Design a protein with these regions (language model features):
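Transmembrane alpha-helical segments of polytopic membrane transport and secretion proteins
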Residues: 1-47, 294-307
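Generic hydrophobic transmembrane alpha-helix motif, especially the helices
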Residues: 142, 152-192, 198-200
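C-terminal transmembrane helix and the adjacent membrane-cytosol boundary/short C-terminal tail
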Residues: 202, 280-307
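Periplasmic/extracellular loop-to-transmembrane helix junction in inner-membrane transport proteins
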Residues: 27-28, 60-128
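Short cytoplasmic-facing helical segments at TM-TM junctions of multi-pass membrane proteins
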Residues: 192-241, 262, 266
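Transmembrane-helix boundary motif in ABC transporter permease subunits
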Residues: 125-155
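Loop-to-helix entry region at the N-terminal start of transmembrane alpha-helices
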Residues: 114, 118-122, 172-194, 231, ...
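Transmembrane alpha-helices
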Residues: 183, 187, 220-253, 280, ...
């Protein structure tokens, strides 16, 4: 096929940086728009919950007023009832607690910041001890089918036991409530990390191990350069689960042993009949738990690779 004179030649389409980055910008804009819509929807849900809460507490106050009038008619005097706290009362309590979270007026009167510090310290120590034992042991179990079969019955027996069931034995043996709380955190944190580490190590791709064997990589280098990066996402999942369980357990443990911690703060405020402080502490526990999960979620993304 011949081209006639004067026929323009087809131009070669060149990929410019602007053209290559266009899909990326489009995906980024889509993600931002979805994030904005999700944020607006979350705000609407929050306003709806606050509205329901406000209406419910108003009905409670009206019912209490009717009971007061009935009591006066019956000659029993005025009945003083506080009812469930309103959102306005909770806002005032939150402002008061957050304005001075680190006050210390005695053994039974400490700020929520100090109590959170005690709880986070116990969780951190128990979690770190569990990681130091569970991850190396999980490596050994995952790399040796024989050791897996030998230890699996013990793991299956000990794993379902509630961590709080160990508290009486810990208090009797250790005779220190704070260390007993750390021990309970260790017990509840060790199993998810141990099982996930063993699973991740045992399921490393055979072709990667075969390449390391072909290159005559020694066992230590293979463990750190091949197995650990491949199993890291699964290990981090176990650590994330362990942290969530540890934060759940420490609240109940501190209610049992008393002394310090956010769990003790909740129980102490309940004994003082301060329902607003109880609700504030419960919400604080939820926010801290969410932040801990976000941290481990970020770490999990850092070690996760795409095939």
């Amino acid at each position: 096929m011949s081209l006639r004179a004067g026929t323009p030649l087809p131009r070669r389409i060149r990929s410019t940086p602007e053209a290559a980055s266009a899909p990326v910008r489009k995906r980024s804009a889509t993600f931002k728009s979805e994030a904005v819509r999700a944020g607006v929807l979350s705000l609407l849900f929050l306003l709806l919950l606050l509205g329901i809460w406000h209406v419910a507490t108003l009905q409670k106050e009206q019912a209490a007023g009717a009971n007061d009038e009935y009591a006066k008619l019956m000659g029993k005097g005025s009945v003083k009832t506080t009812g469930f706290p309103t959102p306005a009362q909770m806002g005032a309590t939150a402002l008061k607690q957050l304005s001075d979270p680190f006050y210390d007026k005695g053994p039974n009167d400490k700020g929520v910041g100090i109590q959170l510090g005690f709880s986070l310290a116990r969780v951190g120590l128990g979690f770190a001890l569990a990681a130091l034992i569970a991850i190396p042991l999980g490596f050994v179990i995952g790399m040796s089918p024989l050791i897996y079969r030998a230890l699996d019955p013990f793991i299956q027996v000990l794993k379902p036991i509630s961590p709080l069931a160990w508290m009486p034995l810990a208090l009797y043996t250790i005779k220190d409530s704070s260390i007993s709380g750390i021990f309970v955190i260790f017990i509840c944190s060790v199993w998810p990390m141990l099982i996930n580490t063993a699973f991740g190590v045992a399921n490393v791709r055979r072709e990667w191990l075969n390449v390391a064997k072909t290159l005559e990589v020694n066992a230590v280098r293979k463990a750190f350069l091949v197995i650990l990066p491949a199993a890291a996402p699964t290990i981090m999942t176990g650590m994330r689960i362990s942290m969530g369980i540890a934060w759940l357990v420490i609240v109940a443990a501190e209610m049992l042993v008393g002394g310090t911690g956010i769990g003790y703060f909740v129980w102490n405020e309940w004994n003082n009949l301060s329902l607003t402080n109880v609700i504030f502490a419960v919400l604080t526990i939820g926010v801290v738990g969410m932040l801990l999960d976000l941290v481990f979620g970020r770490l999990q993304k850092l070690v996760t690779y795409v095939d």
